[in-house]
């Protein structure tokens, strides 16, 4: 399976998004990468959450009319997102999330220790460029699923580094899948390489759907 890279303009993004085929809420939205993909597929991104100021500013430049909740995900509830989008629980089509992943990445673990163990990066505090700090960054995927349980979307799509599937980190990989099931969802997880899906670079990530 191979999708050819296809250049696009922001006009293309907005035109396809106007088709409003499905609606999306995106957590850990960054500068809007996944939001762009959903819009190119005809989706309407109703609201996003982004904690980091620089990423949030980039998102606003790309999509100035999308609602952004800027609080730490640990301080937000599913109801906050439902209120922001005028949806009821169970009405959202897709909840998307890409929790910060440095605790499970090769680069992340090496930055914490030369021993090369995933666990050396766990329980650490991550410092962001705007001065904000987040403790126990490895637990953010479970905050994502906590919000999902409250929103009850039809589909949940979560993404993280492929390092989550190997070594000590695999205990988190298994726990994530178990948590999907505990909140009432069937889950499939697979490592995919972006170069086969229309992206002009090699980047492997594990996706939970």
Located regions from the model:
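Conserved active-site and SAM-binding loop architecture
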Residues: 1-209
